[in-house]
Protein backbone atom coordinates (compact mmCIF):
# COMPACT_ATOMS: atom_id res chain seq x y z
CA UNK A 1 0.00 0.00 0.00
CA UNK A 2 1.44 3.40 -1.04
CA UNK A 3 0.17 6.76 0.16
CA UNK A 4 -0.07 8.92 -2.95
CA UNK A 5 -0.15 12.08 -0.83
CA UNK A 6 3.42 11.29 0.27
CA UNK A 7 4.98 9.38 -2.63
CA UNK A 8 4.98 11.19 -5.98
CA UNK A 9 6.23 8.25 -8.02
CA UNK A 10 9.74 9.52 -8.72
CA UNK A 11 12.76 7.33 -8.09
CA UNK A 12 14.89 7.97 -5.03
CA UNK A 13 18.44 8.84 -6.08
CA UNK A 14 21.09 8.10 -3.49
CA UNK A 15 24.31 10.13 -3.61
CA UNK A 16 27.45 8.27 -4.68
CA UNK A 17 30.72 8.59 -2.84
CA UNK A 18 33.45 9.59 -5.28
CA UNK A 19 36.40 9.82 -2.92
CA UNK A 20 39.04 7.26 -2.07
CA UNK A 21 38.64 5.37 1.17
CA UNK A 22 41.91 5.13 3.08
CA UNK A 23 41.66 1.92 5.07
CA UNK A 24 44.56 2.81 7.34
CA UNK A 25 42.61 5.63 8.96
CA UNK A 26 40.31 3.05 10.56
CA UNK A 27 43.19 1.21 12.24
CA UNK A 28 45.02 1.82 15.47
CA UNK A 29 48.80 1.93 15.46
CA UNK A 30 50.28 -1.55 15.73
CA UNK A 31 52.21 -0.68 18.88
CA UNK A 32 48.95 0.37 20.57
CA UNK A 33 47.15 -2.93 19.95
CA UNK A 34 46.46 -5.17 22.93
CA UNK A 35 48.57 -8.37 22.54
CA UNK A 36 45.43 -10.50 22.88
CA UNK A 37 44.39 -9.56 19.33
CA UNK A 38 47.51 -10.99 17.67
CA UNK A 39 47.03 -14.46 16.21
CA UNK A 40 48.93 -17.35 17.79
CA UNK A 41 49.00 -21.11 18.28
CA UNK A 42 47.09 -23.15 15.68
CA UNK A 43 45.80 -20.12 13.80
CA UNK A 44 49.28 -18.68 13.29
CA UNK A 45 50.72 -22.12 12.58
CA UNK A 46 48.25 -23.02 9.83
CA UNK A 47 48.50 -19.61 8.13
CA UNK A 48 52.30 -19.69 8.14
CA UNK A 49 52.13 -23.26 6.80
CA UNK A 50 49.87 -22.29 3.89
CA UNK A 51 52.00 -19.22 3.22
CA UNK A 52 55.01 -21.46 2.55
CA UNK A 53 53.04 -23.18 -0.22
CA UNK A 54 51.65 -19.96 -1.67
CA UNK A 55 55.21 -18.67 -2.08
CA UNK A 56 56.05 -21.65 -4.30
CA UNK A 57 53.49 -20.74 -6.96
CA UNK A 58 54.66 -18.99 -10.11
CA UNK A 59 53.80 -15.33 -10.65
CA UNK A 60 50.51 -15.19 -12.55
CA UNK A 61 49.31 -18.57 -11.28
CA UNK A 62 45.55 -18.65 -10.81
CA UNK A 63 44.40 -20.53 -7.74
CA UNK A 64 40.75 -21.42 -8.06
CA UNK A 65 38.55 -22.75 -6.62
CA UNK A 66 39.15 -23.88 -3.03
CA UNK A 67 42.25 -26.04 -2.65
CA UNK A 68 41.23 -29.11 -0.65
CA UNK A 69 44.57 -30.54 0.45
CA UNK A 70 43.23 -33.36 2.57
CA UNK A 71 41.61 -34.81 -0.56
CA UNK A 72 44.43 -33.99 -2.98
CA UNK A 73 46.32 -37.29 -2.78
CA UNK A 74 43.45 -39.65 -1.99
CA UNK A 75 42.30 -42.19 -4.53
CA UNK A 76 38.53 -42.62 -4.52
CA UNK A 77 36.55 -45.35 -6.20
CA UNK A 78 33.88 -44.21 -8.63
CA UNK A 79 31.23 -45.15 -6.07
CA UNK A 80 32.94 -43.10 -3.34
CA UNK A 81 33.43 -40.09 -5.62
CA UNK A 82 29.81 -40.14 -6.79
CA UNK A 83 28.63 -40.20 -3.17
CA UNK A 84 30.15 -36.74 -2.55
CA UNK A 85 28.07 -33.57 -2.89
CA UNK A 86 28.32 -31.93 -6.32
CA UNK A 87 30.36 -29.00 -4.97
CA UNK A 88 32.99 -31.34 -3.54
CA UNK A 89 33.21 -33.33 -6.77
CA UNK A 90 33.76 -30.07 -8.67
CA UNK A 91 36.49 -28.88 -6.29
CA UNK A 92 38.38 -32.18 -6.42
CA UNK A 93 38.18 -32.24 -10.22
CA UNK A 94 39.24 -28.60 -10.64
CA UNK A 95 42.07 -28.97 -8.12
CA UNK A 96 43.78 -31.71 -10.15
CA UNK A 97 45.62 -29.53 -12.72
CA UNK A 98 47.15 -27.33 -10.00
CA UNK A 99 48.07 -30.31 -7.81
CA UNK A 100 49.68 -32.08 -10.78
CA UNK A 101 51.62 -28.98 -11.87
CA UNK A 102 53.15 -28.53 -8.43
CA UNK A 103 52.99 -32.15 -7.28
CA UNK A 104 56.57 -32.42 -5.88
CA UNK A 105 56.18 -29.14 -3.98
CA UNK A 106 52.74 -30.07 -2.69
CA UNK A 107 53.87 -33.52 -1.55
CA UNK A 108 56.87 -32.26 0.41
CA UNK A 109 54.93 -29.36 1.91
CA UNK A 110 51.90 -31.48 2.82
CA UNK A 111 54.01 -34.13 4.55
CA UNK A 112 55.87 -31.44 6.51
CA UNK A 113 52.65 -29.80 7.74
CA UNK A 114 50.36 -32.80 7.90
CA UNK A 115 49.55 -32.50 11.60
CA UNK A 116 48.17 -28.96 11.44
CA UNK A 117 46.43 -29.38 8.06
CA UNK A 118 44.54 -32.40 9.36
CA UNK A 119 43.88 -31.06 12.85
CA UNK A 120 40.64 -29.45 11.68
CA UNK A 121 38.90 -30.03 8.36
CA UNK A 122 38.86 -26.30 7.59
CA UNK A 123 42.64 -26.02 8.03
CA UNK A 124 43.15 -28.15 4.94
CA UNK A 125 41.14 -25.81 2.70
CA UNK A 126 42.40 -22.59 1.13
CA UNK A 127 40.00 -20.16 -0.55
CA UNK A 128 42.30 -17.79 -2.45
CA UNK A 129 40.17 -14.84 -3.59
CA UNK A 130 42.84 -12.29 -4.48
CA UNK A 131 43.33 -13.11 -8.14
CA UNK A 132 46.51 -14.37 -9.80
CA UNK A 133 49.68 -14.76 -7.75
CA UNK A 134 51.76 -11.57 -7.72
CA UNK A 135 55.45 -10.89 -7.18
CA UNK A 136 56.35 -11.50 -3.52
CA UNK A 137 52.76 -12.55 -2.81
CA UNK A 138 51.85 -13.84 0.61
CA UNK A 139 48.79 -14.74 2.61
CA UNK A 140 49.86 -11.98 4.96
CA UNK A 141 49.52 -9.31 2.27
CA UNK A 142 45.76 -9.72 2.51
CA UNK A 143 42.76 -10.07 4.79
CA UNK A 144 42.08 -13.54 6.15
CA UNK A 145 39.06 -15.22 7.69
CA UNK A 146 38.91 -18.68 9.23
CA UNK A 147 35.50 -19.82 8.02
CA UNK A 148 33.54 -23.06 8.12
CA UNK A 149 34.30 -23.41 4.41
CA UNK A 150 38.05 -23.00 4.90
CA UNK A 151 40.72 -20.33 5.14
CA UNK A 152 39.52 -17.43 3.01
CA UNK A 153 42.05 -14.89 1.73
CA UNK A 154 40.74 -11.65 0.22
CA UNK A 155 42.36 -8.57 -1.28
CA UNK A 156 43.89 -6.24 1.29
CA UNK A 157 42.16 -3.09 0.04
CA UNK A 158 38.62 -4.38 0.57
CA UNK A 159 37.45 -5.12 4.07
CA UNK A 160 35.67 -8.49 4.46
CA UNK A 161 32.11 -8.67 5.69
CA UNK A 162 31.88 -8.42 9.46
CA UNK A 163 30.39 -11.71 10.56
CA UNK A 164 29.31 -11.98 14.17
CA UNK A 165 31.83 -13.67 16.50
CA UNK A 166 33.03 -16.68 14.52
CA UNK A 167 34.76 -15.11 11.51
CA UNK A 168 36.60 -12.06 12.80
CA UNK A 169 38.79 -10.65 9.99
CA UNK A 170 42.54 -11.03 10.38
CA UNK A 171 44.68 -8.13 9.17
CA UNK A 172 47.43 -10.13 7.52
CA UNK A 173 50.13 -7.47 7.47
CA UNK A 174 50.12 -7.29 11.27
CA UNK A 175 49.02 -10.90 11.90
CA UNK A 176 46.19 -9.83 14.16
CA UNK A 177 42.42 -9.69 14.43
CA UNK A 178 40.64 -6.42 13.78
CA UNK A 179 39.68 -4.99 17.17
CA UNK A 180 36.09 -4.17 18.18
CA UNK A 181 36.92 -0.44 18.12
CA UNK A 182 38.25 -0.72 14.57
CA UNK A 183 35.10 -2.61 13.58
CA UNK A 184 33.04 0.22 15.08
CA UNK A 185 34.95 2.78 13.01
CA UNK A 186 34.32 0.75 9.87
CA UNK A 187 30.62 0.90 10.69
CA UNK A 188 30.96 4.69 11.18
CA UNK A 189 30.16 4.66 14.88
CA UNK A 190 31.69 7.66 16.71
CA UNK A 191 34.67 7.21 19.02
CA UNK A 192 32.34 8.04 21.91
CA UNK A 193 30.23 4.95 21.21
CA UNK A 194 30.55 2.63 24.19
CA UNK A 195 31.49 -0.94 23.38
CA UNK A 196 30.82 -3.90 25.62
CA UNK A 197 33.86 -5.00 27.66
CA UNK A 198 33.01 -8.47 26.38
CA UNK A 199 34.61 -8.66 22.91
CA UNK A 200 32.30 -11.47 21.79
CA UNK A 201 29.26 -9.30 22.42
CA UNK A 202 30.85 -6.33 20.64
CA UNK A 203 31.79 -8.39 17.57
CA UNK A 204 28.28 -9.83 17.45
CA UNK A 205 26.61 -6.41 17.71
CA UNK A 206 28.89 -4.84 15.10
CA UNK A 207 28.57 -7.83 12.78
CA UNK A 208 24.79 -7.50 12.89
CA UNK A 209 24.78 -3.71 12.52
CA UNK A 210 24.53 -1.48 9.45
CA UNK A 211 26.93 1.34 8.66
CA UNK A 212 25.70 4.50 10.39
CA UNK A 213 26.50 6.80 7.46
CA UNK A 214 24.68 4.49 5.04
CA UNK A 215 21.56 4.52 7.21
CA UNK A 216 21.70 8.31 7.45
CA UNK A 217 22.13 8.66 3.67
CA UNK A 218 19.21 6.38 2.85
CA UNK A 219 16.84 7.95 5.38
CA UNK A 220 17.75 11.58 4.58
CA UNK A 221 17.52 11.00 0.81
CA UNK A 222 14.18 9.26 1.21
CA UNK A 223 12.72 12.01 3.40
CA UNK A 224 13.92 14.73 1.02
CA UNK A 225 12.46 12.86 -1.93
CA UNK A 226 9.10 12.68 -0.17
CA UNK A 227 9.49 16.34 0.81
CA UNK A 228 9.07 15.48 4.48
CA UNK A 229 12.16 17.51 5.41
List each model region and its residues.
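Flexible, glycine-/basic-rich loop-and-beta segments that form/coincide
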Residues: 1-54
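C-terminal target-recognition/interaction regions appended to catalytic cores
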Residues: 35-229
Amino acid sequence: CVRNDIYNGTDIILPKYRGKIEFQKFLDKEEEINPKYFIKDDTLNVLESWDKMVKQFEIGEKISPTIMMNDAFKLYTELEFNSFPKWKQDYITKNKPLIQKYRPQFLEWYNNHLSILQKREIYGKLEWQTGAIKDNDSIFNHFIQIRQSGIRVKKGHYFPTLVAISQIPIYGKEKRYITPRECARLQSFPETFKLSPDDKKSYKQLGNSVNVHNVYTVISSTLKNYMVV
